[in-house]
Amino acid sequence: MFIIITLLLTVLVSGIFGAVPAVVSHRRVSRRDAAWAAGLWLAVWVFALCAYHRPGLTVGFHAFRLVALTAMTGWAGLVTAGLRSLGRKGLKAVVPLLAVTALGLEMFVGNVAYFNTHSYTPFQLVDYLDDNINVGRGVGTISLDEGRTYLRFLDIDQPIYNLRFDGLVSDDTEPLHADSAVIFTIEGTDAANTELTRFGSWQVGLQAPRTQVISLDLTGSVGMLTLTAAGYSSTYAQFPVALTFRGITANAPRALDFSILRFCAIFLALLAVYGLRPASGLWHRRWLAGNVCDRAAAAVLGLVLAAFVVVIPFWEPSNTGLATKDYNTAFWDGESTVSFVYQQYGALAHSLLNGRLDLEADPPAELLALDNPYDAGARDAAQINDIHWDHAFYNGRYYVYFGIVPCLLFQLPFEALTGIQNLAYAPCMVLLGLIFLAACFGVVGQAVRRWFPQASAAAYLLAVAAVALGSQFYCLLLRPYIYEYAILCGAALLMLGLWLWLSAASTPVEKRGALVVKLVFGSLCVALVAGCRPQMELFAFLAVPIFWPRYIGQKRLRSRAGAGEAAAFLLPVVLVAAGLMWYNAARFGSPFDFGANYNLTGNDMTQRGFNAVRIGPAVFTSLFELPSWQGVFPFLRETDVQTNAVIRTISEKFTGGILAATPYLWVLALPLLPAFRRCLHRRRVAACVVYGSPAVMVVMTVVDCEMAGVLYRYLMDYSPVLLLGAALCWFCAEGALSRRAALGEGTAAAALPALRTVMAAAVAYTAVYRFCTLFAMEPYLQGMNPSLYYTVSRLVQFWM
């Protein structure tokens, strides 16, 4: 009865909303309106058929389901009718509709489990627990531990559509395990499986309530069901089984669990889709025109990207290097408002303030006695465990081989001003990340201003997003270790320096004061990169094409003013180079020895040398290996470097080579086309960036694999400038097609929207890929922050 009424009601509602655009436009209802109404009605019922498949759409169909489906039809009708009627009225009309769309998607789709479980009749699964099973039994509670991990339920003989833990708490008293995870293997028998069969696993975050219920898709009545618990375990985190619960409810009606975070994410995604559609004004207005809507879009993009910069470094509490009574409490000293743990740069800052270049810590006598202290096997054989891992060891003392600049910028002044040692890297990386992000906006903006003034606002915004998301920027933020800290500092200074250089090259010579300031600070930033990540200094060659037109082409260098500007450009480079060379010579006896070969790590860096067999696997893995996608969160699988060479390979896991995993970069192949090449060559400086960045990419890949290994974070050495080169190609292609389309060329007019769609799709893919890498890559949020990992997992996989 109710289903028939619902069918009729939804037909009526669909018909009304299908006709609304005709009424608003004062025209007769057309077949197109009828098609919209029919499509709307069909879409709602197809969704209902999928959503109510447990136990079936017609089973338990009552008034609540009638109201739910009618309301969903009304929401979908309102949205479609509104977009059809007001879609071309501009943002003021569309934004409220997009908000309503996001609200409905969160309510009806994100909370589909609330609607499809409303009619369930729950029962307590613990009533069927086998009395012979060894578990901890309290007053109304059951406990599991490492010796008791098995639950068996017998003679259930009724369907089970979901399971929910009631009153689940952790019994683990170890502070490091305050946030932990347990994985239950589910086995049982049902109408289709008379023998015990493994059905799947249930990953439970003890501080992630969304994970404490799971949907089951079993056949018919369940006879027996077993749950076997195992603590999550990886190289970086291991959790024991230690939990207590009051019960396990089967066929539990799910609560309405509205997520503001998911609603905001959906709304922003819809806003981006609307803003980047081919007919959008963002594509038809020049960025340099300064339109208020374009600037507002840039502000939204910047705020979203900056929000992730601020929060990501704190996603892995035990790796942040700081602790309070409420955050990372396992490392809190119990007294300070904020306490910091030992960090290499903190120890270096303390030594520098005490007039020393080495660290104050004394190496163990057993290490000093070894013939080759860099041999990890020899250290293990001598049972020397009390060493400073990844520190340089030279002439019996510990040193920091990582570049000194991050320490000079943050740790040293912090201790000098406050007296507090070991400033954590995470807050420093937040500041550096914001600088890098601002520099991305600035560098791309200068490129548009100088070479592509006709570039659309959408192309500019997509380019900024591509540089930030396509590089390993956010992956560095996720791991606030000294390795990532030094690389991020180098990348931020490099991009800031390039921004200042480009701005200087665009500054009129009449404004000499501003010009000199930009030259000095631009060169200072780029020079300081050598004290962070020396490899990145290869991009200093960009100074030649940037300043060539003015100082060589226009012969300004021959003038007194030009010579003074050249001196301003060179002075910071000379001073920084002299300082770094003195620092190296004072420690290791050579101005060119940064000390990386004296690293106490898992292999003897002093014997590494050059070997050509490393190059092939490194180039393939770093550049061309395809991402390995899977059907479950986080949707990406890590891969290891593969090689047939019988050699010690130093590597970390990858999720695809940068060229294969970043479609935005594929446009770098366009210069192979003669017509595009001619167009690009009209902007010779831009062409130098386009050609130079892939060349540096190859050189750095080879250098990194020979010097250290094949590591994903090393892609950050060149990826920002490489992505900038790709952005220049997109600008060039868009500009060429726009000019030809304006002249009436049909092919160009048809190709331009396609190009823009592909550009937006490439950045969208990159954003999804980067989001997945944050949850897929080591040291694995699944173990470092289970509550965050599993909560996000369930927000994405809402159907579970």
How should these model regions be labeled?
Residues L423-P453, L496, L500:
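Transmembrane-helix motifs of polytopic, lipid-linked glycan transferases
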Residues I3-L40, F64-G110, I260-Q343, A458-Y460, ...:
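Start-transfer (signal-anchor) and selected internal transmembrane alpha helices
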Residues R28-W45, F441-Q472, A492, P508-V517, ...:
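Transmembrane-helix signature of polytopic, membrane-embedded enzymes
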Residues V338, Y342, N354-F402, A468, ...:
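Interfacial juxtamembrane loops and adjacent helix segments
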Residues F539-V574:
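Perimembrane helix-loop-helix junctions
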Residues M495, V517-R533, A540-F541, A567, ...:
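Membrane-interface alpha helices of multi-pass inner-membrane proteins
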Residues L488-V509, L524-V526, A540-L542, V721-G725:
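Specific aromatic-rich, kink-prone transmembrane helix
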Residues V13-S25, N644-R684, R740:
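Hydrophobic, aromatic-rich transmembrane alpha-helices
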